[in-house]
Amino acid sequence: MRIILYDRLQDSQYFEEEIHAAVKAAENAGTYVMVHVYVPQAITRAIQAGVKSIEHGHLIDEATMELIARKEVWLCMQPFTLDDNQYPTQEQQEKHKMIVQNTDNAYRLAKKYQVKLGWGTDLLFNPANTKNQNKDIGKLKNWFNNFEILRMVTYDNARLLSLSGSRNPYPGDLGVIKEGAFADMLLINGNVLENIQLLENPDDNILLIIKDGQIYKNKL
């Protein structure tokens, strides 16, 4: 999250022409471009350049959210809270606080305009924090019911990744359980439609992990 660590939040960085060149190069390679961005001006610039997915976007305003919906661009946000990260300087802490304070507004606008929502985290780069990813899923309860959350993190995420077209490395459909699909499945000890926070304790509550048809964990 370079923009929090070093840059000003209002910096838009790349010119539209530069982003457009990246989009065309990606299209030539059969895939798409996503951008990590927070502020309305930068989000709008990216969309105008042909970007298909906005990562983060927490400082978005209503006009820009309406643009995302109209252009059918994906928005991949995270339910940030003040205790997510401990930044070393006061300036970095203040920038993180601004993002956290607008997270509620961003999710409410996304629901209002029925934007296509994906979900992901940056925690994969920090093995010690990887277990906290499932806690972030639970935080989505502030805006979505459990069915909406499960659909977002499975089926909807798979739809987003399918934008990679011919470069998609998976031989079957993702995010669904059906014959011929890519066999990634979890068996949970409990009903996550009733209690999404079961996922926050994977050691005890995830009984079976199947990835690409191979069993990686079996506590049955």
Question: Each PLM stretch: what is its role?
Answer:
Residues H20, E66, L150-R151, Q197:
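Generic structural signal for individual residues within well-ordered alpha-helical segments
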Residues V37, A46, L67-A69, A110-K112, ...:
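Extracellular/periplasmic catalytic domains that process cell-envelope and extracellular macromolecules
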Residues N28, Y32, Q101-N191:
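His/Asp/Glu-enriched, well-ordered alpha-helical/loop segment
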Residues Q13-I19, V100, P169-G180, N205-I209:
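Glycine-rich, flexible loop segments associated with nucleotide phosphate handling
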Residues M1-N105, G118, L123-L124, N189:
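Active-site core of metal-dependent hydrolases
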Residues Q90-K97, P171, L199-P202:
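Short, surface-exposed loop/helix-turn segments at secondary-structure junctions
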Residues R167-N168, E179-L220:
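C-terminal cap of metal-dependent C-N hydrolases
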